[in-house]
Curated annotation (Swiss-Prot):
UniProt-annotated glycosylation sites, renumbered to this chain: N127, N166, N201, N291, N341
Source species: Bos taurus (Bovine)
Major location category of this protein: secreted
Record-annotated disulphide pairs: C334-C367
Pyrrolidone carboxylic acid PTM sites in chain numbering: Q19
Function noted in UniProt: Affects the rate of fibrils formation. May have a primary role in collagen fibrillogenesis.
Any one annotated GO CC term: extracellular space
Name the UniProt record assigns to this protein: Fibromodulin
Length: 376
């Protein structure tokens, strides 16, 4: 059966039997000769928020079309721009501001990014409770100068940008309406279990590039969370339980050394997991840790693995470069190898390990028949 399968595959690849006898690793060489590129399917770091009301030029949008600019409403703070064409947006970014100006009640989108603001005083948004979007990234805000209830009255707030500041803890309480919370590039060291309480509508949480050592069970109540980014922190263990709706998990550049058995079972929609640049060893991984049928991409590069961990046959991209792997076990990809059972893996990176091309077993072409790139 094995020889028949090899003959069939060789015919599909336009390779002769003579070629196979001459080089038992013809299949590996064939893949290396194919033109393949690695495209990151998702960029998890959108540092600058998309502005729904584009305001280009000092004279405003109307000026670009040849019509004279309309006068700004009288309630607009003199430090800011309030384009008449977009009456619910207020632009106060890049003005060297050291304080938050008055916000008119009609505003829904306010931009205070890239200033020298160090505090968010209590009641500063009480006049504009209909706010949907607040951008405060790129300032000098510290946790001790954030009003305790400064966001509590904003019952419609959906996006809050507080990244690139000097925060040491997550502001609380936050409105239930919040969908995106950007707290990356701060100095947050821990996430208490109740820090994110009530945020049942939150879909994206960015906490990368902080000093977080533990998060406990703070993520369990985030039932709508799709994206969680905790990369570039000081975590030694993964969060205690993941939200059931989670699709993207980023934990690279931490100090994680183990992942519990069936850890991802409670997140049946999980597609992308990145755990590169940690301290993972095979002793810290159970046999079913990554055997999740929903996973499409798994990045375990630059750890301390010596063996390829078992993965689901549905996995499409597996990155294991920069480990200490010294053997190629086909059972990590296919528990049964035949014509009807095979892996959907398309990209496999094993470069920078202790494994050689000759370590690939003879039945690898049958199991990994869909692979377009294998690097050793």
């Amino acid at each position: 059966m094995q020889w028949a399968s090899i003959l069939l595959l060789a015919g599909l690849c336009s390779l002769s039997w003579a070629q196979y006898e001459e080089d038992s690793h013809w299949w590996f060489q064939f893949l290396r000769n194919q033109q393949s590129t690695y495209d990151d399917p998702y960029d998890p770091y959108p540092y600058e928020p998309y502005e729904p009301y584009p305001y280009g030029g000092e004279e405003g949008p109307a000026y670009a079309y040849g019509s004279p600019p309309q006068p700004e409403p009288r309630d607009c703070p003199q430090e800011c721009d309030c384009p008449p064409n977009f009456p619910t947006a207020m632009y106060c970014d890049n003005r060297n501001l050291k304080y938050l100006p008055f916000v008119p009640s009609r505003m829904k989108y306010v931009y205070f990014q890239n200033n020298q603001i160090s505090s968010i005083q209590e009641g500063v948004f009480d006049n504009a409770t209909g706010l949907l979007w607040i951008a405060l990234h790129g300032n000098q805000i510290t946790s001790d100068k954030v009003g305790k209830k400064v966001f509590s009255k904003l019952r419609h707030l959906e996006r809050l940008y507080l990244d690139h500041n000097n925060l040491t803890r997550i502001p609380s309480p936050l409105p239930r309406s919040l969908r995106e919370l950007h707290l990356d590039h701060n100095q947050i060291s821990r996430v208490p279990n109740n820090a994110l309480e009530g945020l049942e509508n939150l879909t994206a949480l960015y906490l990368h590039h902080n000093e977080i050592q533990e998060v406990g069970s703070s993520m369990k109540g985030l039932r709508s969370l799709i994206l969680l980014d905790l990369s570039y922190n000081h975590l030694r263990k993964v969060p205690d339980g993941l939200p059931s709706a989670l699709e993207q998990l980023y934990l690279e550049h931490n100090n994680v050394f183990s992942v519990p058995d069936s850890y991802f079972r409670g997140s049946p929609k999980l597609l992308y997991v990145r755990l590169s640049h940690n301290s993972l060893t095979n002793n810290g991984l159970a046999s079913n840790t990554f055997n999740s049928s929903s996973l499409l991409e798994l990045d375990l590069s630059y750890n301390q693995l010596q063996k390829i961990p078992p993965v689901s046959t549905n996995l499409e991209n597996l990155y294991l470069q920069g480990n200490r792997i010294n053997e190629f076990s086909i059972s990590s990809f296919c528990t049964v190898v035949d014509v009807m059972n095979f892996s959907k893996l398309q990209v496999l990176r094993l470069d920078g390990n202790e494994i050689k091309r000759s370590a690939m077993p003879a039945d690898a072409p049958l199991c990994l028949r869909l692979a377009s790139l294998i690097e050793i």
